[in-house]
Amino acid sequence: PLQYRADAEVFIISKSRYGVDPYTVVKSAERVGENIAQVMKTDDFYQKVITQEGYILDLTDFEGEGVTERTKRKRWQKAIQSSVVFGTGVLHVSAYHEDPGQAKAFAGASVDTLVAKGWEYVGGDVTMKVVNKPVVTKFPARPNLLVNTVLGFIVGVLLMGVVALRRK
């Protein structure tokens, strides 16, 4: 199935101590961001996201009938991805879903969860702020590879047929 991507960004602010240079503060924020990127893949973070107020999330992919815990975790790890923009202390969060509105909702709930409850993962000396609200891609970000492969094969055969007929 085609999936849309919603991107949001969170700025990680390390409360600096006197005598610490800005480079060290940014490097500290990067390290915290790397840790958070790993924590976002966990079931604990998933539970916090789905209870985040202000968002209506479609959880059928994660909690539908016959979905095992292992399947739920794999799907969650594919649905939410995050990475640190190096040199900035900015955490880039992407959410994927078949419905663009749901992709935006999952990205928004994820970054709001980080701002509200991220201190549980990194301690109290770090604060986070949403610097870019979620924005959805206009076109699907994850195409259906099987359909694209079959269509590519068919178009290739048709084009080769046209080329072969013109050469005769």
Predicted features, each with a name:
Residues 1-168:
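Hydrophobic and amphipathic membrane-targeting/association helices
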